[in-house]
UniProtKB/Swiss-Prot annotation:
Catalyzes the transfer of a dimethylallyl group onto the adenine at position 37 in tRNAs that read codons beginning with uridine, leading to the formation of N6-(dimethylallyl)adenosine (i(6)A). It comes from the Bacteria. This is tRNA dimethylallyltransferase. Disulfide bonds: none annotated. GO terms for molecular function: ATP binding; tRNA dimethylallyltransferase activity. The gene is miaA. Transmembrane segments: none annotated. It comes from Synechococcus sp. (strain RCC307). Its cofactor is Mg(2+). Pfam families: IPPT.
Amino acid sequence: MTPLMVLVLGPTASGKTSLGIALAQQLDCRVLSIDSRQLYAGMDIGTAKPTRDEQQQARHELLNLSTPDQPINLQQFCSHAQTLIEQEQQRGRPALLVGGSGLYLQALSQGLQPPALPPQTGLRQQLQQLGQSCCHQLLSQADPQAAAKIEPNDPVRTQRALEVLYGTGQTISSQQGRCPPACRVLELGLNPSDLKERIEQRTASLYARGLVAETETLSRRYGADLPLLQTIGYGEALAVLAGRLSESEAQALTSRRTWLFAKRQRTWFRNRHQPLWLNTESALEEALEAIAAARS
């Protein structure tokens, strides 16, 4: 039987976590979480990381791999993930990848091979001192192709692209080869019509569960200038702590930023993947039917 990789993809707040757990229970496999922020310990509420109860319902992997001040690059992540994918397939189980981080999903499902350059701590410190705006401008001049794919407010990926450029003398775009995986890939997509309402509900839940307190803990431990604390949710919570926003204003801004991000995610998935889009009301049944057909 040809090994099978199942991707459950979709924008944030689309219901991927619940579907992933249900599929893992039905298929007797693990959930491999493909989320670029859930990799970090202590970033639980703001990333909507599966709760302790959800992790007891199905075993989750690729969570809490590092601390927020020790970034994991794409090559390191793929190495961790590939080991787990091979373990699942060797046991005769589908590798179940669940997440919304498009580049990570693309790398694993389409064989994108990122440069194997270890993090350059000294260079990263220099880049952080320059500031994100300056770094993205530098990248735009040196590697326009990479800059076009990276959001101007994404310091982690911007710094990594510059790190590869200065560390190897070649652009990251020129080093991203492809080696398609030796397995069948089934892509299942979620894109509910009420996504905006779901985002607003989830954002309210994050703040009610203690997003501001979690952000305060992280900023005390790692510093308020930590790049990951500038991302959606944490950036607004920092503004609350600094007195620049009320919590209600921060919640509204987080919802807006999340909605814009979700729209970009949907565009990415439509352009780079060809998923079977599932009906939200019957997603589990449709997913199981598609998986059974792919395994036959």
